[in-house]
Amino acid sequence: MKKVLSVASEAVPLIKTGGLADVVGALPAALAGQGWQMRVLIPAYRGVLAQLGKVKQVWGDPDLFGGPARVVLGKCGGVEVMALDAPHLYDRAGGPYSGPDGDFWDNAERFAALSWAAAAIARDGAGGWQPDVVHAHDWQAALAPAYLRYWGVQIPTVLTIHNMAF
């Protein structure tokens, strides 16, 4: 069975601002019937961990882009979800990209960290699981294939741009 790490900034039903979340949330079930095992990696925004219920840590970095981070594994709606828990980057009021005062000033750094974690998981594995393919969704995950290439990791990658307007 091929294993795919699907990396995105949002996924239904955990966090949604648009159609990206719908696709990322539906893809694992759609591909499971074709023999693919998928895990979704998203940031652990405020409230995401509570929706995952019981989780276990599968990866960690004591200094990911300026603070400690861990990836935890849980389930939501039958989908295995990995959440990047880095409070210094994601535990904020508002949505995934903006707060009460507008866009977060460090969005580029926040999503570069998500891509870094995805690439590290693809390179080293996480909790005994290592993907055969990394599927990056939109600009927020687009650096994952670049990090893998820079590190010389020979793993297939896919980058899907869901809406060119963003």
What residue ranges belong to the model's regions?
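Catalytic cores of nucleotide-sugar-dependent glycosyltransferases that transfer UDP/GDP/TDP-activated
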Residues: 1-166
